[in-house]
């Protein structure tokens, strides 16, 4: 079940932020910025330690007021020798609301600009990992909301510096456990540093037993000592060098997002698309609906969709006006009275933030829909619609991405320095250090020896005449959806399983029967809507979705084939999942901290189907 995040309650004691829950202050009464710089940055040898590095990773055990992050970000900005990319991972059980951060940060005018940017990107307070891109993506904040031990266990990263913060050991015993120090040792890069304000014996002992060489330093202000440490233990095997050139096969949202994430990490990308332009398949629909999922058990699909949805809200805004989308809200009506009762009870138990999802009664549902709908439902105020093609074009608009269209890939050939991509006649199309298969069902054909249970499901959307439903200003769903659009409302979508057509065929010609099914969906959502137009005024568009039995995507390294990766099986959640999964795959390929929990990454990895491997 979803664990509710309880925000911190802001109090001040003598002008210093104070936690009544822990009976401790958030920083020294002698000055917060000075403490951050002396104890944590200087304690970890920063900024000198990151000089000339391509990337540098900091992990903090308590985000608190965000002071250490702001001080580190400011130091990175001010340093001409700064690394190209700064990752800052921080865990927090009780995060502040953005408005409270504004009150706290007002004490530190030197961070005013950074604070405003941070608060403008502050995530909804929901459990899990939240990847926040700042400074054009050169600074990556991964905010992990939840219990520290659980969050840190899910981190996949190689850490260069640890900020051990999070209230005094005798006030926050849940954090300062032996497991914490074991986790630090597992995550530490060779020679990683650590710093903390405390010199308590259990902390010194825990660090020492985990392989850190510790030393006391002069403390800050009235505190006599603080502590620094350097990891001298045994590290995990070093990560292979990141590829310089990656070929991405497939120009839909999965491939476009992966290509952009890779090029943003300094990798040269060639994208091969078999059609005449990107976004010609399912990614070519006039609009697509984006919204989160809710489930009582908070399963993998729910957690992945939540993380991806929240990431989209920030990332799409950063792409600018070239992305056509609207946070108009999605009203999802209950199917029947029994379903309504279950959904209302579930929402009450989960206690989600109202701006994420809330229950609305029949009267409010009718107000939101501007229609006499027949059921109450769940309202997702931050959700809405997006034009998938505009997303693809925005992601691919980068000089480091070489787009090649009309390139049908026949097979892949492993070569000494990577991979060769061949057409169906055996002619070379490209060579690359690594390859990403983002070509839906066809990924199975190119990944020799794999037997992923990818299959296609045909889906058709139906375009209504322009002006036929002028009242509809937001997406309304109920076993289907109707969405506003520039060319007229769009109704969708059919989910046609193989019993209705040949398994894995490529028939995308519109079908009258599919339009009829969509119009029946429309009538169930908006009673009387089909009387606004005649049926021969509608038009259909069909495409094929690649899906898997567990309804999760297929993202990660292909087992036994070094340098080969896959991003497929996004089904009907492609626009929601693609951005964050592209980031995750690019981080995996380049050896950077992952933006998702390790358990989620395992849940979407190709290795989960290892037992299905083909034999010769």
From Swiss-Prot:
Entry keyword annotation includes Transferase: yes
Enzyme nomenclature, EC number: 2.1.1.61, 1.5.-.-
Subcellular location, principal: cytoplasm
Keyword check for Methyltransferase: yes
Ranges where the record places region FAD-dependent cmnm(5)s(2)U34 oxidoreductase: 249-616
Any one of the GO BP annotations: tRNA wobble base modification
Reactions catalysed: 5-aminomethyl-2-thiouridine(34) in tRNA + S-adenosyl-L-methionine = 5-methylaminomethyl-2-thiouridine(34) in tRNA + S-adenosyl-L-homocysteine + H(+)
Molecular functions (GO terms): flavin adenine dinucleotide binding; oxidoreductase activity, acting on the CH-NH group of donors; tRNA (5-methylaminomethyl-2-thiouridylate)(34)-methyltransferase activity
Taxonomy, superkingdom: Bacteria
Listed GO CC annotations: cytoplasm
Keywords carried by this UniProt record: Cytoplasm, FAD, Flavoprotein, Methyltransferase, Multifunctional enzyme, Oxidoreductase, S-adenosyl-L-methionine, Transferase, tRNA processing
InterPro entries tied to this protein: FAD-dep_OxRdtase, FAD/NAD-bd_sf, MnmC-like_methylTransf, SAM-dependent_MTases_sf, tRNA_MAMT_biosynth_bifunc_MnmC, tRNA_MNMC2, tRNA_S-uridine_synth_MnmC_C
Ranges where the record places region tRNA (mnm(5)s(2)U34)-methyltransferase: 1-232
Subcellular location: Cytoplasm
Names of required cofactors: FAD
Pfam families: DAO, Methyltransf_30
Family according to the record: In the N-terminal section; belongs to the methyltransferase superfamily. tRNA (mnm(5)s(2)U34)-methyltransferase family. In the C-terminal section; belongs to the DAO family.
HAMAP family: MnmC
Described purpose of this protein according to its UniProt entry: Catalyzes the last two steps in the biosynthesis of 5-methylaminomethyl-2-thiouridine (mnm(5)s(2)U) at the wobble position (U34) in tRNA. Catalyzes the FAD-dependent demodification of cmnm(5)s(2)U34 to nm(5)s(2)U34, followed by the transfer of a methyl group from S-adenosyl-L-methionine to nm(5)s(2)U34, to form mnm(5)s(2)U34.
Full protein name: tRNA 5-methylaminomethyl-2-thiouridine biosynthesis bifunctional protein MnmC
Species this protein is from: Thiobacillus denitrificans (strain ATCC 25259 / T1)
């Amino acid at each position: 079940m979803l664990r509710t995040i309880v925000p911190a309650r802001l109090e001040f004691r003598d002008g210093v932020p104070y936690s009544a829950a822990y009976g401790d202050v958030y920083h020294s009464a002698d000055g917060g910025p000075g403490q951050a710089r002396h104890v944590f940055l200087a304690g970890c040898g920063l900024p000198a330690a990151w000089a000339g590095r391509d990337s540098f990773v900091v992990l903090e055990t308590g985000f608190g007021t965000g002071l250490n992050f702001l001080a580190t970000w400011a130091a990175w900005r001010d340093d001409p020798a700064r690394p190209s990319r700064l990752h800052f991972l921080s865990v927090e059980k009780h995060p502040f609301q953005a408005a409270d951060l504004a009150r706290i940060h007002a004490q530190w005018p030197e961070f005013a600009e950074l604070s405003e940017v941070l608060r403008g990107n502050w995530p909804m307070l929901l459990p899990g990992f939240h990847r926040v891109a700042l400074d054009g993506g050169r600074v990556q904040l991964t905010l992990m909301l939840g219990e520290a031990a659980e969050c840190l266990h899910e981190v996949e990263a190689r850490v260069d510096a640890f900020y051990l913060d999070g209230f005094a050991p005798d006030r926050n015993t849940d954090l300062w456990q032996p497991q914490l120090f074991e986790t630090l040792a597992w995550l530490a890069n060779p020679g990683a540093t650590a710093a903390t304000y405390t010199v308590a014996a259990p902390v010194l002992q825990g660090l020492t037993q985990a392989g850190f060489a510790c030393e006391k330093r002069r403390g800050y202000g009235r505190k006599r000592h603080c502590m620094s440490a350097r990891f001298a233990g045994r590290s995990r095997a070093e990560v292979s060098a990141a590829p310089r050139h990656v070929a991405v096969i497939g120009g839909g949202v999965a491939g476009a997002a992966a290509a952009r994430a890779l090029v943003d990490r300094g990798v040269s990308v060639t994208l091969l698309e078999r059609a005449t332009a990107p976004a010609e398949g399912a990614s070519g629909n006039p609009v697509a609906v984006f919204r989160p999922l809710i489930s009582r058990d908070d399963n993998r699909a729910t957690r992945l969709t939540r993380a991806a949805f929240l990431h989209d809200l920030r990332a799409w805004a950063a792409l600018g006006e070239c992305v056509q989308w609207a946070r108009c809200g999605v009203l999802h009506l209950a199917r029947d009275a029994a379903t309504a009762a279950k959904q209302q009870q579930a929402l009450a138990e989960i206690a989600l933030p109202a701006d994420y999802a809330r229950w609305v009664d029949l009267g409010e549902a009718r107000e939101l829909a501007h229609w006499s709908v027949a059921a109450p439902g769940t309202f997702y105020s931050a959700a809405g619609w997006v034009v998938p093609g505009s997303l693809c074009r925005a992601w691919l608009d980068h000089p480091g991405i070489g787009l090649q269209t009309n390139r049908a890939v026949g097979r892949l050939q492993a070569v000494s320095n990577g991979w060769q991509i061949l057409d169906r006649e055996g002619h070379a199309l490209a060579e690359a250090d690594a390859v990403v298969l983002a070509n839906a069902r066809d990924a199975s054909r190119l990944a020799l020896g794999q037997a992923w249970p990818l299959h296609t499901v045909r889906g058709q959307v139906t375009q209504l005449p322009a002006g036929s439903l002028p009242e509809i200003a937001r997406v309304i769903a109920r076993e289907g959806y109707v969405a506003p659009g520039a060319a007229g409302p769009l109704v969708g979508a059919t989910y046609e399983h193989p019993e209705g057509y040949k398994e894995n065929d490529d028939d995308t010609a519109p079908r009258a029967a599919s339009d009829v099914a969509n119009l029946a969906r429309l009538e169930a959502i908006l009673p009387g809507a089909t009387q606004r137009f005649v049926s021969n005024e509608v038009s259909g568009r069909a495409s094929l979705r690649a899906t898997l039995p567990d309804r999760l995507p297929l993202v990660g390294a292909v087992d036994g084939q070094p340098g080969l990766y896959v991003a497929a099986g996004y089904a009907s959640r492609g626009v929601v999942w693609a951005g964050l999964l592209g980031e995750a795959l690019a981080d995996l390929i380049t050896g950077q901290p992952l933006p998702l929990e390790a358990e989620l990454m395992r849940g979407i990895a190709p290795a989960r189907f290892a037992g299905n491997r083909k034999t010769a």
